[in-house]
């Protein structure tokens, strides 16, 4: 399927649509309206119609969207038939939680290897995932052809580890550290800062109290 260039905001919403369509399909529903989708995924219906418009005519005016057809389409767009192996770098408290989770509700993503400096866990299998020593990082990432990694190392090691991952061919990094990483233009970094997100939530709640 030809790659379609879409806005980043649209790309982030596609998995939301796909997950809800899975639910509808399991319930045996044949069609869904943009209004129903809007209420379920908390995205306004105008944005949904605009998102879908990037892919051509996916629905019919007055009818809505065929659930099976839409599900099949987004399955291809999101590569749901292709298994993506992801590396976890750093097996501390957050890393262990991610290992235990390991995208169990996803059919196409899995953490296939993990790395840490702790000799008590390296060389072992945790939650079904082999944990390697950080000294083996570049070799294993290259040998296993891993292109996506989750980074949960201490801040002091974040940039150094990133440089090693990039050298090994990693092209996508989900960064859970508070450090803003420096990476080549062809490497995409997605920052996940839980503390910042919570602080933002607290700010908005406090603002609503004042009003």
UniProtKB/Swiss-Prot annotation:
Q: Which UniProt keywords apply?
A: Cytoplasm, DNA-binding, NAD, Repressor, Transcription, Transcription regulation
Q: Name one GO biological process term.
A: negative regulation of DNA-templated transcription
One GO cellular-component annotation of the UniProt record comes to: cytoplasm
What GO terms are given for molecular function? DNA binding; DNA-binding transcription factor activity
UniProt entry tagged with the keyword Transmembrane helix? no
* Residue numbers binding NAD(+): 90-95
Where found in the cell?
A: Cytoplasm
Q: Which Pfam families does the entry link to?
A: CoA_binding, Put_DNA-bind_N
According to the entry, DNA is bound by residues in 16-55
The UniProt similarity line reads: Belongs to the transcriptional regulatory Rex family.
Subunit: Homodimer.
Record's function text: Modulates transcription in response to changes in cellular NADH/NAD(+) redox state.
State the name under which the record lists this protein.
Redox-sensing transcriptional repressor Rex
């Amino acid at each position: 399927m030809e790659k379609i260039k879409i806005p980043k905001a649209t790309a982030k919403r596609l998995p939301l649509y796909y997950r809800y369509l899975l639910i509808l399909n399991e319930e045996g529903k044949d069609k869904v309206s943009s209004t129903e989708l809007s209420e379920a995924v908390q995205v306004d219906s105008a944005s949904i119609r605009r998102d879908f418009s990037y892919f051509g005519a996916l629905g019919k005016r007055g009818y809505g969207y065929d659930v099976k057809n839409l599900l099949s389409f987004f399955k291809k767009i999101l590569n749901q038939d292709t298994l993506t192996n992801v590396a976890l770098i750093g097996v501390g408290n957050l890393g262990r939680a991610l290992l235990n989770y390991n995208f169990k509700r996803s059919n196409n993503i899995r953490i296939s290897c993990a790395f840490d400096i702790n000799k008590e866990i390296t060389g072992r299998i945790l939650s079904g995932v082999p944990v390697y020593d950080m000294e083996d990082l570049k070799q294993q990432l290259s040998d296993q052809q891993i292109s996506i990694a989750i980074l949960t190392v201490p801040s002091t090691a974040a940039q150094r580890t990133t440089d090693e991952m990039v050298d090994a061919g990693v092209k996508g990094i989900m960064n859970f550290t508070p450090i803003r990483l420096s990476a080549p233009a062809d490497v995409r970094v997605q920052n996940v800062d839980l503390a910042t997100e919570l602080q933002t939530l607290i700010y908005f709640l406090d603002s609503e109290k004042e009003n």
